[in-house]
Amino acid sequence: MNYKVVATSKDTKARAGVIGTDHGEIQTPIFMPVGTVGAVKAVHMHELRDDIKAQIILGNTYHLYLRPGMDIIERAGGLHKFNTWDKPILTDSGGFQVFSLSSNRKLKEEGAAFRSHIDGSKHLFTPEKVVDIQRSIGSDIMMALDEYPPGTSDYQYAEKSLRLTQRWLKRGWDHFNATSPRYGHSQAFFPIVQGCVYKDLRTDSAKFVADLGAEGNAIGGLAVGEPTEAMYDMIEVVNEILPEDKPRYLMGVGTPANILEAIDRGVDMMDCVMPTRNGRNGMLFTQHGIMNMRNKKWADDFSPLQEDGASIVDKIYSKAYVRHLFVAQEILAMQIASVHNLAFYLWLVGEARKHIIEGDFKSWKTEMVERVTRRL
C-alpha cells in the first residue's frame, strides 16, 4: 500500500490524497460503507460500484470468523472472491464487537476470551490470531486488536486499557511482519490510537503508534458517549503527532457534520453504520438537511426524492412513494434509503476533496455543516 498527498487546505488541516492498493486506488478523503458480514445491508455489490460509487468497503473480523468461518472464506479464495467485490476491503479487528456483543468476555494478557453471540461457543482472540484471521479474509487493510473502553471511562481504567492495547499492538505488529498474504495481493496493517478523552493518554498512544512505522494509522475509541467537542479535541491532539505521509482513519464516525469536521482536522478515512442503519429507519441525509420519511408532510409530495441527488433512486422515486413504502413496512423502502444515504455520503466526501483541491474548503465546509444539520 502507498499514500500520496495531492493537495492541502491553506486554512485547515484538510488534505486530499490517493491511497494505492493492489485492488485499486482510493481517492481521499473517503467514506467507507460498512459491510459487516461481507455485505452492506440491503445494497447489491453492483449498486455499491456503479451507483453509490464506493471505492472501499469494510468487513468485520469477529462476524466473518464466527459465520461463515475461515474455512469457507479460504476455500472461496478470500473475501473479495466470496462477495464479488473487486475493489479494496478494510477489516476491523473485531475488538469492538467482542466488547459490545459477546457475553462473558474476559480480558487477559493473552487476549480477549468471549462467547459467541450466535451460539454461546467459547473463543479467544489474541493479537496474533486476529492477524491470521485477516490473512485468511484477505483484506487490503487489516486492523490491530485493541481494547475498546467506553468514552466515559475514568482515567485509571483508560490508562490500564491503553497499556494492554499497546502490548497487544506490539505482538500483532510482530506477527504481521512474520507472516505473508495468502492470495497474492499485499496487505497493510493499521495500529489504533486509543486513550479515551485524556489528552496525555492520546498523546502517548499517538507517539507509540507513529513510532511503529505502519503504512497507515487509525484513531479509535471516539463517538462512544463523549461530548462531540471532546471528540474533535482528541482528533486534533492525535493528528498533530501522526505522520503526515500516512493515511489517518477515524473509526466509526459519523454524521455528515462529524465527517466534515474530521476532514477539517486532517482525517482521510471514515466509516459508520449511520447511513444504512438510520436509512432503514426512514432518515435520509441530504445536502439540504435531514428528512424523516415517515412524516406526514411527505404523503402528497410527488417531487423526486432529491432532484440534485447523487444516486438514481433520488430521481426515479418520489417523496410520497418512499414515504408510503416506509409506512407500509415494505422492504424496498430500506433499500432505497440505504442507496440514497450511502451515495450522499460518498458525494459529500467527494465534494470535500474537490474543494480542498480548489482551495476553498473552509468556507464550503462552514456552509455545508449548517445545511446538513437542518431538519426538513
Where are these regions (language model features)?
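Non-catalytic, usually N-terminal nucleic-acid engagement modules in DNA/RNA processing proteins
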Residues: 1-182, 296-299
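C-terminal extensions of enzymes
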Residues: 1-18, 26-33, 41-42, 146-152, ...
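Conserved, mostly hydrophobic/aromatic
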Residues: 24, 57, 92, 134, ...
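Active-site pocket-lining/capping segments in soluble small-molecule metabolic enzymes
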Residues: 85, 90-91, 95-102, 108-118, ...
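Structural signal for hydrophobic packing residues in well-ordered secondary-structure cores
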Residues: 138, 169, 173-176, 180, ...
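Glycine- and acidic
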Residues: 151-155, 159, 216-222, 331-334
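Glycine-rich phosphate/ribose-binding loops and adjacent secondary-structure elements
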Residues: 163-166, 179, 186-305
